[in-house]
Amino acid sequence: VTAHTDPGRVRARRRAAVRATAALALALVSPGLTAPVLAAPAAARSPDGPVALTQVHPFKGGDQPCAAVGDDVVEQTPWTHHFLGLSDAHELSTGQGVRVAVLATEVDGGVPALAGAVEGGQSADCLGFGTSLAGVVAARHVEGSGLVGVAPGASVTVVPTGDTGTGLAPAQAIAAGIGNAVGSGARVVLVGTAAWEGSAALDAAVADAAEADALVVAPATVPTTQGPLPGHPSQDPSVLSVAAHGVEGAPVAQGPLVLPTGDLARVDLTAPGDRVVGTGPGGGHVVTAGDGVAAAFVAGAAALLMAREPDLTAAQVRERLVSTAYSSPLGDADPLAGGGRVDPLGAMATAPGGTAAGVAGEGFVPDPSPHGSVDAPATAVVVCGSLLLIVLCVLGGAVLRRGRARGWRPAAPGEPLS
């Protein structure tokens, strides 16, 4: 019995087999194409040390105890130091001669890392947050510790602001603190914790600071039990509004915040603000996070630039820091990152007018994009190889069909080979 098969169906099945073979080959040689990998800056280091550190926060309940900070010290250099390229930056400037005012409830000025750096500090810090901010800005090197501030040559003036038991700082208190900071001669004013509401007095204090050529740096948001809210005075265009990014450079915020006016909350820059190792009251190290911590890094970067170029105005310093930041993949319109990640070395290595100076630094590390990134050369090789394999599979199928049709005999003169 001879079975007759529809030639059209046979050809269709063969074409399907060829396509399946090609698809399988493509999947085998290019598994990475199905899931782009997020780019991660090579300079980032894990913040985890060999010991568990106390985490400090900008706020606490009035009936909660003070932060219990031990005397453990991390010997490794924190990830933030590598991420910001501070070793190279300190070859150009340490912030010597620049006064930075830190608005916080308390700062323990007696810790070894802040010895000789702090004016107006207290002997204790219930929250521990103010001491960590001062350390981010200007901690000096201490033997056995890998921690050093962004501007270890700068001086810190502590301006007590907010309730020492809770950390809450209303707009009126911040306004008074900014006024006191400007009166002390500070060129940089760091607002440690923002207010969730503005006020006419706060607007006036910010205007007075700009008139006195002092740069106000403040957190973009204020944390609450209901989630983050837009911070004040960060919504003022003359204030450098800073948001936190994590160890891979991506913004910590999950989405933009909207003001009552319908406008998006302002963000000018991002800086490290997640799992940051800092100085704690008593001399031990702590872990902290948030936009206030990120603002402290930017305040330190401003001090570095002011010390290197003392003739720059506060507005020019602000513009330089924003224009030299590692920009977001979405550009300046990114509602979470603003101008991008602060780059202290880039800000100092860029001469007025935008001409880069010849300063050796760390290799460029592109910001991570939420859409991922693909290694272009490797991808090109994989794609070309995959296409070649597909072509060979198709041609092989055609030759196979012709050979079977001829019974595998040699082609007669003039008979097509394919």
Residue ranges and their predicted role:
Residues 3-6, 39-97:
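Protease zymogen maturation seam
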Residues 31-51, 359, 368-378, 397-408:
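C-terminal region of N-terminal signal peptides and the immediate post-cleavage residues
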Residues 1-45, 383-400:
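Secretory targeting and sorting signals
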Residues 88-100, 107-118, 124-170, 263-266, ...:
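Subtilisin-like serine protease catalytic core
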Residues 164-232, 286, 293:
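Substrate-binding/access-modulating region of protease and related hydrolase catalytic domains
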Residues 309-401, 412-418:
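C-terminal subdomain of the subtilisin-like protease fold in secreted/lumenal serine endopeptidases
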Residues 96-100, 153-156, 183-189, 211-216, ...:
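Loop/turn elements at helix/coil->beta-strand transitions in domains of secreted/extracellular proteins
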Residues 234-307, 311:
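Extracellular S/T/G-rich loop segment that most often corresponds to the catalytic His/Ser-adjacent loop
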